[in-house]
């Protein structure tokens, strides 16, 4: 008789309990076919999480296959815990972005904190030491108290985990729109550095080699977290609060240091973080990649309390855990290491020469599954898309009130300074941060060298909703420009695809078109995709979020000397690079004045992006520029105001544009601040003004003149978000 009371095989089938776990009738029947029998309760649980959208990408695999994944600098692409890219001198950068959207909607602090912890462990499992964190966040408008609470909880969670573990949060982006009401997006990115000969893989091979568990003892937290992340958010989602994991950054710090020491042991065969689907995914994926079988002895798994069943052990997503495969006979060496770091650890199984994934508790078998069926035989769904009906009417901007529009845009939380939020993050721990959060990409020095890694994370959801194909190209190009703006050579990217339900034809078409655009941009800009994540079913009460592909990109700065005086001063001249057109569809001014997204903006020219990018990068590296800013949300006037306010400098400019064009968001533009006595050699650059030491921001065109005190702009811009949050405890 079994030690654990669970539903019988007959009950699972007759009462269709598998549906509650996330399997459809067809998927359950396929499991029966694979096993040659009906599955027991633990086996159904294992298939349900491994075949969930979150783990199997069953609706998105066809789109992911089109991304370019190889390139001159790529050492390791998709398939492992994170991507690895060469930066010279036998060193590499390791990076990835992951989503933690659904957990953050239910429990914002822990959802965000464990998102940070999970992405850190992905980087550490490759053998890299993390050097910085980034995040991309989306919330509903801050006029809604629930959105204020979500924002405060998420920011506290990010800061609480990152600050405790000692990794600086150096860049990010946050946007607000009512399409994210009840369904915030929390995408966390981590970047690390490693020597080539220390790169690890998550593989289990070598018959008789041992499987070691290390980290927090397994509890009941996070059970079916992967399945929960693959569903729409509903009013019943609150009841799934136990599916949200609990983070412990202090144990996370110990685990990180112990892991980085363990990878120096020659006897280490493979290592993987226990992330989504916990012990199930880490063990079965390692076996599949190693072409081996595994036998786990679950009575040896460290548990937080007695009575935890094999089903619960395998599906728990308790945080701060790693799984290792080590050479037989060397187990004690690793156990002693983990004891030194005050971590629980145990030998819980061994590699076999079969193709079976076998789970035992004492002498009872709780699962016997073909390994490859979990990793490679999940169903893949190719659905039909359908173009949405676009709003093609033209909005009228001819009578725009420049001053009023400027002031309203400046204090909208999407455009306002995020200083109030970022100051809650430790930005300098490690003392290698060169450029902190604010206006630009992050730049972090590679310790012991004169090199630096630049990183950015970006999204353009309104544009992707407007025109998915062009919007997909645009988000990759935006990240590319942001790296160029600090003088970095873009190397590769990671992506997080946040969409609604793929079972809706319009959403599926957005996936088709936007990923096609992203893929084309990656090819032209030579930024292959080396890692990523997909988060679907981001819907609340039947309303989908905007399609929000987020791109994290890294670049290399071979010599940081030019950054020593990369800081604007009074007397430095301002140049605009790039043509300004009447591009308002998807823009912030369109949202402010008309609300809905109009289907109108011109295609992005990727070849022109490359040509301009090289010219701008060379200008920065030659020491001519003291600051470069991409022209982004809100348009040229807002971009100039942000530069002026951020540095506390006056600004005077005369621009040959219409009033409306001051707020146009035409892509591919840069503001270059040129040092006194230097000459800018970019043919299409137009001098538009200069920075001053006067407390005045003055921009004129043929129609209007806007004159404001810089100190007042700075106060409004930097204080807007704090002002929004004063209404919540």
Swiss-Prot record:
Q: What's the subunit arrangement here? A: Monomer. Part of the FGAM synthase complex composed of 1 PurL, 1 PurQ and 2 PurS subunits.
Name the NCBIfam families for this protein.
FGAM_synth_II, PRK01213.1
Q: What is its main location?
A: cytoplasm
Q: Name one GO molecular function term.
A: phosphoribosylformylglycinamidine synthase activity
Gene symbol of the encoding locus: purL
Q: Which family does it belong to?
A: Belongs to the FGAMS family.
Q: Which InterPro entries match?
A: PRibForGlyAmidine_synth_PurL, PurL_linker, PurM-like_C_dom, PurM-like_C_sf, PurM-like_N, PurM-like_N_sf
Q: What does this protein do?
A: Part of the phosphoribosylformylglycinamidine synthase complex involved in the purines biosynthetic pathway. Catalyzes the ATP-dependent conversion of formylglycinamide ribonucleotide (FGAR) and glutamine to yield formylglycinamidine ribonucleotide (FGAM) and glutamate. The FGAM synthase complex is composed of three subunits. PurQ produces an ammonia molecule by converting glutamine to glutamate. PurL transfers the ammonia molecule to FGAR to form FGAM in an ATP-dependent manner.
**UniProt binding sites for Mg(2+) 2:** 122, 273
EC numbers, comma separated = 6.3.5.3
Q: Where is this chain's protein located in or outside the cell?
A: Cytoplasm
Per UniProt, where does substrate bind? 99-102, 121, 245, 317-319, 535
Q: Which Gene3D superfamilies match?
A: PurM-like C-terminal domain (3.90.650.10), PurM-like, N-terminal domain (3.30.1330.10)
Instruction: Name the Pfam families for this protein.
Output: AIRS, AIRS_C, FGAR-AT_linker
Example of a GO biological process term: 'de novo' IMP biosynthetic process
Q: What is the lineage of its organism?
A: Bacteria, Bacillati, Bacillota, Bacilli, Bacillales
- Which residues take part in binding Mg(2+) 1? 98, 533
Name assigned to this protein: Phosphoribosylformylglycinamidine synthase subunit PurL
Pathway membership of this protein? Purine metabolism; IMP biosynthesis via de novo pathway; 5-amino-1-(5-phospho-D-ribosyl)imidazole from N(2)-formyl-N(1)-(5-phospho-D-ribosyl)glycinamide: step 1/2
> What keywords tag this UniProt record?
ATP-binding, Cytoplasm, Ligase, Magnesium, Metal-binding, Nucleotide-binding, Purine biosynthesis
Q: Which PANTHER family match?
A: PHOSPHORIBOSYLFORMYLGLYCINAMIDINE SYNTHASE SUBUNIT PURL (PTHR43555:SF1)
Amino-acid positions noted as binding ATP in the UniProt annotation, renumbered to this chain? 57, 96, 495, 532
